[in-house]
Design a protein with these regions (language model features):
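Glycine-centered recognition micro-motifs in short, flexible terminal segments and loops
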Residues: 9-34
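C-terminal juxtamembrane segment of a hydrophobic transmembrane alpha-helix
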Residues: 29-52
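Acidic side chains
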Residues: 19-20, 44, 61, 207
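Short, conserved structural patches
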Residues: 2-10, 57-208
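Membrane-embedded alpha-helical bundles that form the substrate/pore pathway
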Residues: 24-28, 44, 57
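N-terminal start-of-chain detector that recognizes signal peptides
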Residues: 27-28, 37-38, 170-176
Length: 208
C-alpha cells in the first residue's frame, strides 16, 4: 500500500514537472530572439557612435590643416588641386589608416570641383560596403553671429545678410556604414530604415 502511494506521488510529481518544463521552453524560445536583438543593438550602435567620434575628430583636424595654409593657393584654379586641399586629404587618409578604417582608395581618387569646393566621392561597394565622400570647401562663408551649424552633407556657405561675413574652411566626411541591427530587427517584422552612412562636419577660420 505504501509502495502504491509512493508510485502515485511520483507519477503526480512528473505530471506537474512536465508543464513547467514546457513553459520554460516556450519562454526561452520567445526570449532568445529578443536577447539576440538586444545584444546586436548594443554592439551595432556602439560601433556607429565610435565611428561618429572618429569622423568628427578627423574632420576637425582636416579643417584646421587646410585653414592654416595660405588662401592664395585657391586663387589659381587652373593649376590643379590646391596644396591646402591635398594636405586636408592626407590628414583624412592617414587618420583612417591609423584607426584601422578602410580608406576605400581615397588617396588615389581625383576630386571634382565647384567654385572653391573639392569633393572626393567613392561609391559604396563590396560587403560590407566601403564608400567615402569627402568635401573640402576652402571658402566657407558664414555670418559672425551664426548659430546655425554647417550642412554636414554639402558644406555650402551660409548667407551673411547684413552681418559681417567670416570665411573659413569646411570639411565634411561621410562614411558608409552597414547596420547589422536592421537585419535582425527585420526578423521581428520591422522594416525601419537606418542611415546608410555616418557623417561629421567641422569648420575652421582661414588664418592666411
Amino acid at each position: 500500500m505504501i509502495r502504491a502511494a509512493y508510485v502515485r506521488t511520483c507519477s503526480l510529481g512528473r505530471q506537474l514537472v512536465r508543464p513547467d518544463r514546457a513553459a520554460q521552453l516556450v519562454e526561452f524560445a520567445v526570449s532568445l530572439p529578443l536577447l539576440v536583438l538586444f545584444v546586436v543593438g548594443i554592439f551595432d550602435f556602439s560601433a556607429a557612435f565610435t565611428l561618429k567620434q572618429k569622423l568628427t575628430n578627423v574632420a576637425r583636424d582636416a579643417a584646421r590643416v587646410a585653414a592654416a595654409d595660405p588662401s592664395a593657393d585657391v586663387g589659381n584654379l587652373s593649376s590643379g588641386v590646391p596644396s591646402s586641399v591635398i594636405d586636408s586629404l592626407k590628414v583624412v587618409d592617414s587618420y583612417l589608416t591609423a584607426n584601422r578604417l578602410n580608406d576605400c582608395g581615397l588617396s588615389t581618387k581625383t576630386p571634382t570641383r565647384s567654385g572653391v569646393t573639392w569633393t572626393y566621392t567613392i561609391a559604396p561597394t563590396g560587403t560590407p560596403p566601403c564608400g567615402i565622400t569627402l568635401i573640402i570647401n576652402r571658402g566657407y562663408v558664414f555670418p559672425v553671429t551664426s548659430t546655425t551649424p554647417p550642412d554636414a552633407r554639402t558644406c555650402l556657405s551660409q548667407t551673411p545678410g547684413s552681418q559681417t561675413a567670416l570665411v573659413g574652411t569646411c570639411v565634411s566626411v561621410q562614411y558608409a556604414y552597414a547596420w547589422k541591427f536592421a537585419r535582425v530587427a527585420s526578423l521581428f517584422g520591422r522594416n525601419d530604415s537606418l542611415p546608410t552612412e555616418i557623417f561629421a562636419v567641422a569648420v575652421a577660420l582661414n588664418e592666411n
